[in-house]
Amino acid sequence: MKIYQNQNSKQIIVSKDELNVEGFVELIANTTDAAQEKHVPVYEVRCGKARVSVGSVGHPMSAEHLIEWVMVTTNQGYQVKYLSADGTPEVSFSLSAGEKIEGVYAYCNLHGLWKA
């Protein structure tokens, strides 16, 4: 799965194929020099639910510095949850029978894309 972001609008495109769209650059996970313990998603799957916490140490959530969204990619597609500054960096995703997690991503507004 490839994730692209528009450099001006910050719009995101998710694609299973490589894209060449003007104004969009591919986001590469875990390439920013920042505290991994606050950015790398941690997840567990139980009873058809994937529970995701961003960071082994909770990521701060303020208007200036927050996790904007969390995404899981699976053998059947992907799901995204958007977070807000007044919430916590934790989300849950329901999985279908036979659906397997392939990747878990978190996007920090200051430090970019992170993958478990």
Where does each model-flagged region fall?
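Transition segment at domain starts
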Residues: 13-49
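Short amphipathic, basic-aromatic surface patches that mediate peripheral association
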Residues: 54-62
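Extended low-complexity, serine/threonine- and proline-enriched intrinsically disordered segments
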Residues: 66-76
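Solvent-exposed serine/threonine-rich low-complexity stretches and specific carbohydrate-binding patches
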Residues: 76-86
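Short strand-edge motifs at loop-to-beta-strand transitions and within beta-strands
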Residues: 89-93
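Short acidic/polar inter-strand loop motif in beta-rich domains
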Residues: 109-116
